[in-house]
């Protein structure tokens, strides 16, 4: 998938939003995912993303991507980080995160997506739309 197509599909799914807001939401969502993945997962995923999005999976210092160790945090914290970084209410951060992941799922091969998901705790299936919200899910509240 090309960069502009990724942006356009994301914009359609998360409307309303300006082009710069959509780009910010993608960057925040992918960078937060990148923090949760081990380097091999980030590398596999970034290899299939448009070049303009590759750096979003890595911490950047002075414009250069820096590989970091993974951080282990639950799905609720993932959504909280997205909400804080994108200056969004929590429910909107959940919605946008899921929509970006929906576009991401169409941008990479099923094998890479499965490999990435296998490296995350089961609760992250909700992020990818593969599991319903449970009664104790932060998104069900």
What are these regions (language model features)?
Residues 2, 36-65, 107-139:
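Extended intrinsically disordered, low-complexity coil regions enriched in Ser, Thr, Gly, Ala
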Residues 4-5, 20, 43, 73-77, ...:
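Generic alpha-helical secondary structure signal
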Residues 13-15, 19-22, 85-98, 102-103, ...:
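A domain-level signal for the structural core that forms small-molecule/cofactor-binding pockets
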Residues 1-39, 76, 102:
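The feature marks the first
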Residues 56-111:
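Short, solvent-exposed interaction modules
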Residues 6-9, 28, 61, 81-82, ...:
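Generic signature of intrinsically disordered, low-complexity segments enriched in small/polar residues
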């Amino acid at each position: 998938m090309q960069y502009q197509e990724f942006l356009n599909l994301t914009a359609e799914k998360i409307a309303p939003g300006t082009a710069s807001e959509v780009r910010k939401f993608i960057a925040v969502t992918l960078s937060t995912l990148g923090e949760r993945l081990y380097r091999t997962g980030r590398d596999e995923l970034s290899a299939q993303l448009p070049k303009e999005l590759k750096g979003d999976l890595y911490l950047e210092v002075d414009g250069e991507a820096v590989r970091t160790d993974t951080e282990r945090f639950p799905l609720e914290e993932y959504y909280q980080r997205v909400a804080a970084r994108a200056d969004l209410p929590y429910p909107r951060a959940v919605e946008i995160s899921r929509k970006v992941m929906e576009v991401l799922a169409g941008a990479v091969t099923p094998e890479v997506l499965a490999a990435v998901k296998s490296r995350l705790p089961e609760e992250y299936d909700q992020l990818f739309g593969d599991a319903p919200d449970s009664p104790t899910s932060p998104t069900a509240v």
